[in-house]
Design a protein with these regions (language model features):
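Pyridoxal 5′-phosphate
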Residues: 1-373
């Protein structure tokens, strides 16, 4: 099997990540913060060490600002529904995932929130954002990289625009983290949301959010936090203020190990290798007649063959043992921009662990598929 669906979730997982997960299940899986026995205390240590590891990876000095969530979608919902008030205005990119679009749609219908889209292809991103600022604009919400094309959105420009206008910046780093350096001291934001299971090589069912302000806003969910149990309200301070219920300790341990793997390889090495593989893959795809590529970055290459439905091509590749993703990728705005809203695209998404031999097999498979059509 050739796995080219890493933008959905990375596979295979590094041995270090699997070992950390299994070790936690066997040795450190008490309920953290709920009891005073040794297993509970060790689980609490695992979680705190992971907070420190995530904070260090982002060059943040606030481990208490790292909140563990079920996934990046959960993190984005906490941020969006906690920061955006009724009748306010937000500015988003034209490449957003449904994890941003759908929460905002709910706020539009129920609370009269207004939404404007800026163009990620504008030559001057900051000036482009400036055009949409109004007196009731409260936030910029943007991906750092499209999950359809890999197109990057410059964090420095987003950060400067938000600070200039005194508004929140909420960042979706799902497709960028683990691929490029994110330094929150140099390019600050108010909230950064990410999953564990993509380029950080963690497991599904875990994400996190970084909050610059460690006093919580409105809560999305309430419950036990292991602290201040006499109160019927969630704690005001983070991380407990947003972490209701028992956390996924083994997954959190695996995330810390995944970050160690990324650091060991080196972000520059990851970026350079993916750039080389993207280039070779793009050249191979374009050497086939009737193909069109819509973008190639962050390990993502999206394409279509002739006028054939992307779902058909992806299904045919699966028969050759090649895993890709077709359709709209939960990002209709991006496909509207690309002109692929009716057909979607075939998305090939690579990781550091893919190789040229797999690209060659993909090319041969596409050649055989093209002959049969």
């Amino acid at each position: 099997m050739i796995y080219f669906d890493n933008a959905a979730t990375s596979f295979p997982k590094p041995k270090e990540v699997i070992d950390a997960y299994n070790f936690c299940l066997k040795k450190s899986c008490g309920n953290p913060g709920r009891s005073s026995h040794s297993l509970s205390l060790r689980a609490s240590e695992v979680i705190y060490e992971a907070r420190e590891r995530v904070a260090s990876f982002l060059n943040s000095y606030k481990p208490e600002g790292i909140v563990f969530t079920y996934n990046a979608t959960h993190a984005l919902n906490i941020a969006i529904k906690g920061f955006i008030h009724a009748k306010s205005h937000v500015i988003i990119s034209d490449m957003e995932h449904n994890s941003v679009l759908r929460p905002l749609e709910k706020l539009k219908k129920e609370y009269g929130v207004e939404v404007s889209e800026f163009s990620t292809s504008a030559p001057d991103l900051e000036s482009e954002i400036d055009k949409y600022i109004t007196s009731n604009t409260v936030a910029i919400i943007s991906t750092l990289a499209s999950n359809v094309t890999g197109r990057r959105v410059n964090l420095a420009s987003l950060s400067h625009a938000a600070r200039k206008h005194g508004i929140y910046l909420i960042v979706d780093a799902s497709q960028a983290i683990g691929h490029i350096k994110i330094d929150l001291k140099i390019t600050p934001c108010d909230v950064l949301c990410a999953p564990a299971h993509k380029a950080l090589f963690g497991v599904q069912g875990l994400g996190f959010a970084y909050f610059k302000d460690t006093t919580r806003g409105l809560t999305l969910m309430e419950g036990g936090s292991g602290t201040d149990s006499i109160s019927t309200e969630m704690p005001l301070l983070l991380p407990e203020g947003y972490e209701a219920g028992t956390p996924a300790t083994p997954a959190i341990a695996a995330l810390a190990s995944g970050i160690d793997v990324v650091d060991k390889i080196g972000l520059n090495n990851i970026e350079n290798r993916l750039s080389e593989l993207e280039k070779e893959l793009s050249e191979r795809i374009l050497s086939l007649p009737k193909t069109k590529i819509y973008g190639a970055d962050m390990g993502i290459v999206s394409f279509n063959y002739d006028n054939i439905p992307s779902s058909y091509i992806s299904a045919e590749l699966d028969k050759h043992g090649i895993c890709t993703r077709s359709g709209l990728h939960c990002a209709p705005s991006a496909h509207k921009k690309l002109g692929t809203l009716t057909c979607g695209t075939v998305r090939v998404s690579l990781s550091f662990f893919n190789n040229r031999r797999e690209i060659e097999k993909f090319y041969k498979a596409m050649g055989e598929i093209a002959k049969r059509i």
